[in-house]
UniProtKB/Swiss-Prot annotation:
Mg(2+) binds at D457, D463, E466, E467. Residues 404-483 form the B5 domain. One of its GO terms (biological process) is phenylalanyl-tRNA aminoacylation. It is an enzyme of class 6 (ligase). Residues 694-790 form the FDX-ACB domain. The keyword Metal-binding applies. It comes from Chlamydia trachomatis serovar D (strain ATCC VR-885 / DSM 19411 / UW-3/Cx). It is found in: Cytoplasm. Its cofactor is Mg(2+). This is Phenylalanine--tRNA ligase beta subunit. InterPro entries: aa-tRNA-synth_II/BPL/LPL, B3/B4_tRNA-bd, DNA-bd_dom_put_sf, Fdx_antiC-bd, Fdx_antiC-bd_sf, NA-bd_OB-fold, Phe-tRNA-ligase_IIc_bsu, Phe-tRNA-ligase_IIc_bsu_bact. GO terms for cellular component: phenylalanine-tRNA ligase complex. One of its GO terms (molecular function) is tRNA binding.
Amino acid sequence: MLVPLSLLQKFFSSPLSIEEILQACDRIGIEAECSNVFPDSLNTVVTGKILSASPHPDAERLTVAIVFDGKGERQIICGAPNCRAGIIVPIALPGAKLRNASGEITTIKKAKIRGLESQGMCCGADELGFPHLQKAERGIFEFPADTPLGESACMLLAGAPLECSLTPNLGHCASLLGLAREISFLSPVSLNIPEEFSFASLPQETSICDMHDAGACPVFYSVKISGLSCRRSPEYLQAALTALGQKPLNAIVDITNYVMLSLGQPLHAYDSQAVEQKSLHAATLQSAQPLTLLNQETYTLPAGSLVVADQHNILGLAGVMGSAASSCSENTTEIILEAAYFQPQAVRKYQRTIQLHTEAAYRFTRGVDPQGVLPVLHAAIHMIQSLFPDAQISPIQKIGDDSFSPLSLSVRPKTIKRLLDIELSTAEIVAKLSSLGFQTAVEEQAVRVEVPSYRHDIQEETDLVEEICRTTPFVQKTQKILPTYTPIYSLKRELTAFLANGGLQQFFTYSLLDTEVSSLSLQESSLIPVQNSSWKLRDSLLPGMLKSAATNLHRQAPYVYAFEIGNVYSKEQNRYQEEERVAILLSRQVMDDSWQGKTPLSFYTIKGWVEKLLCQSGASIEDFSLQPSQHPNFHPYQQAALYQKKHLLGIFGTLHPQLCRKAQIKHDVVFAELSLNVLLSLKKKSGPHYVPYPIYPASSRDITITIDRDLPADLVRRELLSFESKWLESVHIVSVYQGRDSASQSKNVSLRMVFRDHERTLSGQEIEEEYERLTALLDKKLANIGQGNS
């Protein structure tokens, strides 16, 4: 965004130096730099006002001028014919170096001219390197009467010395008014609205239109203005638009562009001859339709696009560009001027679809001030009246509701302390936020804040903390060394090192999946599509890893042992969620050529890796339970879900053969995917717990129990461990047997119970009694949840 200093200064109660403006932009978060660089010698060319001008006593063509340069008066002998009292001109102070028409450099010095001392030189624009601004063949350049004195003349003549880059959250700064308002909050000046934007309220009428889309366009204003002509704009308006980076077209269009760039609210003028019944409204297309816009390009507007229309015709793409058929031409004498508030999400949707970027779309997609629509319309009408005194203005037509309910948020001192490590009282919070234009009220241990209508970037308490941060000098902020790593980052480093040391290679795959990769999932409908493209956001690490594994195997890799840590995305209750996960994928056995023969990968291979991962994460395996799973990407009988109480940690198992065939992998593939956030929440804060090695022997007893085939074998083990016993040290599953008869509804589970006392050796009788007690409790427990027989 180009920002002419001469125009920006009009919005301040008193002028600011370039350094002050740049410092304020830096605190706002705007990257600003001078787009024109001048030699240091030209910095001594400043603006000065001629207080008096009298003829030189010894020369007819010379004038003795007394000039005030912002600091003091000085006498300058000038030969320009337009040298007169009251004008503001460029003054080259002694030491300035100017280049003449032949290219030679002249150093300005104090000198006597016909017996009188001259302490500088009054310059023309061509002598400073701006010949295109010189209006007369001979003469000094004249600045507007409101130009501040003592400022760099070259910076003012350059037109756009500042080039500002706005981040998406600073849409309210995309105008001279918005930028000046933010600078005034952080500078010793107040905001000043120039007289050219002053206005008197005009009559207003409310209209009802059944076709108007009030959801996408809460309020829509239009006004008919007649008695106009599309002549060229005055020179000052053309110069201002050029400095702002816009090409002047005609008086009507130039006014709408100038008001938009100055005040931030886009406007559009329609030739009333193209508008049926002289009435406009905003409507949503029910089906795709073609439309030729002002750039003479024809676009197919998708269904759902918001358009500006009359009773039968589309006259413009709302918030982006008007149609060619309704544009103002040299024959236009009557216009309908439109100003509206279009919802950012509505404009953003179709603007990206047709890939058309305009100044209006830039502002609407970031959010304009809903309470500034009518004042800006009044300002534009005022400027039109100043250029066309005989213009007739009809009453303003309003469709929709212009009422506004400000967002109310609370900010607490403890939140500021937690995020910024700064102690602030409620009174200090009120002072800081009030200085930024927020309405505040003190509550119990908090400050209630009303967000201004133009601040679309303020949505929650942390946004207010950011505002407080930028008003706090660095010297007041605590200087402390931040933690080296966040807990989640530390966990990722630990898991990466562990898995890499275990022989696994790390994969890095894209979060966006194309059509080919996204098809490597039997649950494709759950992927989140990216608007206007065939790409989709992944909801699992599986598709990308499976594609990479297939690529490696097709290139004769003997095996694939890989892992990946990355983000996945999902949509729950109309809200998008982002989660970090760790995944392991194994295909083919590393030791296929061993003398022991081939040992194929199985469900238990990946189960072992999951258990290792849990141990490495610092979580206790006993805190988890395995439950049946029916995920379509896995083999229906070789998968399991891992739960911690009611929280799903992840799913693992053998991939579905159909999915392996889609990936053109001939071997079995086992896969596991776990949530890092759940792992982190279960990590033991105290670290590993060490116990002394037992000095007394342990004794074991085996038990085989028949249970329902649908009951998990691990359920029996957990039930045994849940019984209170001072001697039962551990329980392991030895085997699970199910007969070949498909009609059998039971299976045998063999377990080994280990008993030990850490203070003495247990007798055989004590072990037998404890064993009998536990098996009796187990039979009773299993009777309630399924058939059990030990």
